[in-house]
Amino acid sequence: VQGKTVYQDGFAPVEVQRVFARIRRICGAETEITVDTLQGHFWNYDRNQRPPDPAWAKSIWSDFRDFSLYALKICAQVPTDKQVKALQAALPDCDIRCFSGEENWHKITKSTATKANALAPICAACGLTIDRITAFGDDFADLEMLRLAGTGVAMGNGVPAVQAAADITIGPNDTDAIAAYLHTQDR
């Protein structure tokens, strides 16, 4: 808000290494991992192959051996349900969720790093009450935020649970649906 960070909850470097160790122990030493930091997106993809999606072309390659940055989010390829359950048991302080549409990629965040937890500090910084907030979402990580906000808006391509929890569903997030919705609210 006004150029200042209002809420941030991630992994200190020592915690990042703990998460890496658990991933490698459970899923194997060669498991693909990505890390989002304030400095960029890091990935240990096979350097003999290009990243599969041009959107990831700016990823910074790392083997993560000496990785010492604060991480906002860690993602890993976790191929089996058994490995997912083992990872959840090994990291009880983390939220581990499969990306919708990406069956083997799982997002790992601190369990306290939620969009819903960010609403109160944002409201306080802006001098608003939560009932004045309109929140937009399309995936499972958005559910609690949509329920807390004064108006929860699901994207048309969102998962069914998000659409069911929202007050309204608009067009998909690859269109101008949010802008169109906000324009109708501006009157």
Tell what function each PLM region has.
Residues 18, 22-136, 140-145, 157:
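Conserved acidic, metal-coordinating active-site core of Asp-based
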Residues 14, 114, 173:
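Conserved active-site and cofactor/substrate-binding residues in soluble primary-metabolism enzymes
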Residues 1-2, 105-107, 162:
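A short acidic, helix-capping loop that chelates divalent metal ions and anchors anionic groups
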Residues 4-7, 49-51, 114-115, 184-187:
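Short, surface-exposed amphipathic charged segments that create phosphate/polyanion-binding patches used
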Residues 148, 153-187:
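Asp-based, Mg2+/Mn2+-dependent phosphohydrolase catalytic module
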Residues 1-17, 23:
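Glycine/small-residue-rich loop that forms an oxyanion/phosphate-binding "nest" at active or ligand-binding sites
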